[in-house]
A protein has these predicted regions:
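Long, compositionally biased intrinsically disordered regions
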Residues: 1, 34, 210-212
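N-terminal type II signal-anchor transmembrane helix
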Residues: 4-40
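Accessory carbohydrate-recognition regions in carbohydrate-active enzymes
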Residues: 38-265
Length: 265
């Protein structure tokens, strides 16, 4: 009787264990297939007009060092930066699995399938998380709640991405938004093109930081219907050791605001 009970128990136990192992393998296999399907997509080619004028542009791949498995990379970013420049304007991404911010300390991981927005500062290749200042988030036909802006994450595909030295672009067809980034040594230049049928908007997150870092003492002044200025103190992997770093900005829009709203805390 006891022997039969043990045999029955073992059958049930190993049956449950087998089902659990199978479920885990199916989950891992499904996620791996989804991951490979996303990262293996071919990106846009650099226009002939650019390669004709700047032949060496075709020899540079800004996406090198932005991906890796498992979630390890060279902490590079695909955005805009000039030699010895202060500006490092680039997209930020969120995880395919959890929707958390990219584990890449520069803010962009090639295996992430969501775009959070476009920020202006970061470190490169250090493995230290510092920067992510003044995140810009384009929106279209999105209703915002009365007290705090909803977290904005756009699904995207690498087939709609293009980057070469000094330029980055991304199309978000589902939202009817086209993003273009370029810059100078100390300024980032954004161009957002919206479909005529969309209700366009821009969110500026002054308190944003890369990763799980924090910020405080945000300040914003609206000068007129096209100009803003402000500052923030952020505490990253380096700056947090020395009381944080205070970063200032001035922003100018080429189109006057139809209306604006400010959120705090």
């Amino acid at each position: 009787m006891k022997k039969r009970f043990i045999i029955r128990f073992l059958k049930i136990f190993f049956g449950i264990l087998g089902c659990l192992v199978l479920a885990i393998m199916l989950f891992i296999g499904g996620f791996w297939w989804k991951y490979r399907s996303f990262v293996d997509v071919a990106r846009k080619e650099i226009p002939a007009a650019i390669t004709g004028e700047y032949p060496l542009s075709s020899k540079v791949d800004p996406f090198i060092g932005t991906g890796g498995v498992p979630w390890t990379c060279a902490y590079n970013f695909p955005g805009v930066s000039l030699p010895f420049g202060m500006m490092r304007l680039s997209p930020e991404t969120a995880s395919m699995l959890t929707s958390d911010k990219a584990l890449n300390t520069s803010g962009y991981f090639y295996g992430d399938d969501k775009i959070i927005g476009f920020s202006h500062t970061r470190l490169v290749g250090t493995g230290a998380t510092d920067g992510g200042h003044f995140l810009i988030q384009p929106i279209a036909d999105q209703k915002l709640p009365g007290e705090t802006p909803q977290e904005v994450q756009h699904k995207y595909s690498h087939k709609n991405e293009l980057a070469y030295p000094g330029y980055y672009s991304l199309e978000l067809p589902d939202k009817g938004i086209n993003v273009e980034l370029t810059g100078t040594e100390r300024a980032g230049v954004h161009r957002y093109t919206f479909d005529d049928t969309k209700n366009p908007g821009i969110l500026l997150d002054i308190s944003h930081t890369l990763g799980d870092k924090r910020s405080e003492d945000a300040y914003l002044k609206i000068l007129n219907d096209q100009d803003l200025e402000g500052h923030i103190r952020s505490f990253g992997s380096f700056a947090g050791r020395y009381g944080g770093i205070k970063v200032y900005f001035a922003a100018k829009f080429d189109t006057p605001f139809a209306k604006y709203q400010i959120w705090e805390n």
